[in-house]
Amino acid sequence: MSYFNNFPITLYDVDGSGNSKLVTNILKRVRVRANMAKEYSLLDPYDIQDGETPEILADRHHGSPYYHWVIMLMNNVRDPQHDWPKSTRQMQMYLQGKYGSAENQNAVHHYEAPQSSGDTTIRMEVLSNYPGAIEISNYTYEHNVNEEKRSIDLLRNDFLGPFVSEFEREILR
């Protein structure tokens, strides 16, 4: 099933001339029920591999690239250009475009230090003069942001049919 196949059709005056055309209402949204997103028996944790796209992953996991939208919806991926992890090559190009030279990529982005109480594995952003502050470069910062996007949940195939059916019902509401 293609993502937009079941979206409602509406009349829209594209150019303001008074001549309306039938168009797919791409502004319609459906959100995954909170209790479903938290129901771990429905989901399998997965780490996205370098270069995997939602379509590749959907083909491998659900048997069709057309279910890429299920993966994106279940993981709140609205824009795959920004919400999906970049491949190694894409990351190199992104860093080059954003920071330019290797020197700028290795410049200080911010400083971090472990929390002093509670879970000390969690780091907090601090000023450079904070005791124990560690430099985090632009490269390291961007790499860490990208890596955090790799952990997702995949809907188990037993629940794919009911999920798609519910989506089709809800999108027409």
Predicted regions and their residues:
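Cell-surface/extracellular proteins and modules involved
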Residues: 1-173
